[in-house]
Regions:
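Short, glycine-/polar-rich solvent-exposed loops and beta-turns at beta-strand/coil boundaries
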Residues: 14-17, 159-161
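Conserved RecA-like P-loop NTPase ATPase core
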Residues: 2, 23, 90, 149, ...
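Walker A/P-loop NTP-binding motif
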Residues: 1-13
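Phosphate-binding/switch region of NTP-binding enzymes
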Residues: 86, 94, 105-174
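Conserved inter-motif catalytic segment of the P-loop NTP-binding fold
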Residues: 10, 16-100, 105, 109, ...
């Protein structure tokens, strides 16, 4: 959903409010570049000025990095004329700074950093996270993460050769 927000193009038949997007590619940066290029070709778009990509992780559990992220969001707004509406941390494991993902204390610091970024920028913060070995048990690590989430979606594959992506809402607060 990052690219429709950055361009203001409809997503799956729904109107989208345009804004800037910050994509933190903590892993798979080359793959992200390929997917962005494929989307540009498919949608005949060649102006993604509202998409800022960082090829290195940001650690929301680190107060200095939280401040730097907020300042960077304001720089993006100044440059593009659009407030940052979406910040994507891809993935939690890479943006966790070596902390223990099973520790509620460490996860609490990560959540607090994300909340501070969200509150001070007004952006939605999306964290890409991997499930554990048992997919039915949800994401890896401390249970304080799912407890703090407003919304959680699970992405799975289905069908012949696992071609179809299925997006399932597994939690919706309020």
């Amino acid at each position: 959903r990052a690219l429709p927000i950055a361009t203001g193009k409809d997503w799956d038949g729904h109107k989208v409010k345009q804004g800037a997007v910050l994509y933190v590619a903590g892993e798979g940066g080359f793959g992200v570049t390929q997917r962005v290029r494929a989307w540009e070709l498919q949608h005949k778009v060649n102006n993604l000025d509202n998409l800022a990509r960082l090829p290195v992780p940001i650690f929301p559990a680190d107060n200095d990095q939280v401040k730097a992220t907020i300042e960077y969001c304001y720089e993006i707004e100044s440059k593009t004329g659009h407030a940052v509406k979406l910040i994507i941390f891809d993935t939690l494991a890479r943006c966790y700074g070596g902390n223990d993902e099973n520790s509620s204390k460490d996860m609490g610091a990560f959540i607090k950093g994300c909340d501070t970024i969200k509150q001070l920028t007004g952006a939605t913060v999306l964290v890409v996270h991997h499930s554990g070995k048992n997919v039915d048990n949800g994401g890896r690590g401390s249970s304080s993460l799912p407890a703090a989430l407003d919304v959680e979606y699970r992405v799975s594959r289905e069908g012949e050769n696992l071609q179809a992506l299925i997006l399932t809402c597994s939690k919706m607060k309020d």
